[in-house]
């Protein structure tokens, strides 16, 4: 549903505008009249963006939420995923929307990736956030169609433009379509390895690996921050797990 996607991203961009304006508002400003006027204008901008965002959110739910059937629009994974990821779903309906995503992904489509370049940007992190790390791991590792593992199992050395890049007719134009990787890499670093940014620019770091995934034998990961290298190396042992970390 193109209108749903456009409206959801309009709301998301308004949230970014609020953050950008707030960052400027929090910066020191000159005490002269020009500085005071700029400060006042930023405060007014924030209020305007907030009011517009609430209006968009209200209209979004009024237009796309099917109260009778308990899903958004045409009930695709992306249609339910975007409002959940962008915090547009009313609190009373969040669990219901999460269940729709799991049902569609696991039960209806046999635990395969059922979204394209738009939805896949948010799929893994939302599965983790809703507590379904088991589903996220299956999607990350299976070799069935459609999925990243299917590409690798069929000779891909980069990310295809299409999930069925080996059989598409007409053939795909791009064999290096990195955007279809979605949020898989953040999932690997932030969830599996547990290296998480807890403050802007990695000024603070949270370390929380996915020890609960018994299927994972070991993880070796590192990330270069502005303050130095962070590493997280862990492995399963007979007693539980062994974890080695280093921080700047």
Where are these regions (language model features)?
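Catalytic cores of carbohydrate-active enzymes
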Residues: 2-5, 9-172
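Non-catalytic C-terminal accessory modules of carbohydrate-active enzymes
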Residues: 33-40, 51, 55, 134-248
């Amino acid at each position: 549903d193109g209108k749903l996607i456009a409206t959801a991203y309009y709301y998301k961009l308004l949230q970014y505008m609020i953050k950008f304006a707030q960052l400027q508002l929090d910066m020191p400003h000159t005490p002269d009249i020009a500085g005071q006027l700029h400060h006042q204008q930023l405060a007014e901008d924030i209020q305007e963006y907030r009011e517009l965002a609430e209006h968009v959110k209200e209209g979004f739910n009024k237009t796309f939420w099917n109260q009778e059937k308990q899903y958004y629009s045409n009930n695709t994974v992306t249609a339910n995923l975007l409002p959940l990821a962008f915090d547009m779903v009313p609190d009373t309906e969040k669990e219901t929307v999460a269940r729709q995503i799991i049902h569609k992904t696991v039960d209806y489509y046999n635990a395969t990736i059922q979204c394209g370049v738009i939805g896949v940007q948010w799929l893994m992190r939302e599965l983790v956030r809703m507590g379904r790390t088991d589903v996220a791991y299956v999607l990350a590792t299976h070799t069935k169609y459609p999925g990243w593992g299917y590409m690798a199992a069929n000779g891909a050395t980069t990310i295809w433009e299409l999930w069925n890049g080996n059989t598409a007719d007409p053939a795909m134009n791009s064999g290096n379509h990195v955007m279809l990787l979605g949020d898989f890499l953040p999932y690997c670093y932030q969830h599996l390895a547990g290296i998480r940014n807890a403050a802007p620019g990695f000024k603070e770091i949270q370390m929380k690996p996915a020890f609960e995934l018994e299927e994972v034998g070991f993880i070796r990961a590192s990330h270069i921050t502005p303050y130095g290298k962070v590493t997280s190396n862990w492995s399963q042992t007979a007693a539980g797990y062994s974890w080695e970390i280093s921080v700047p």
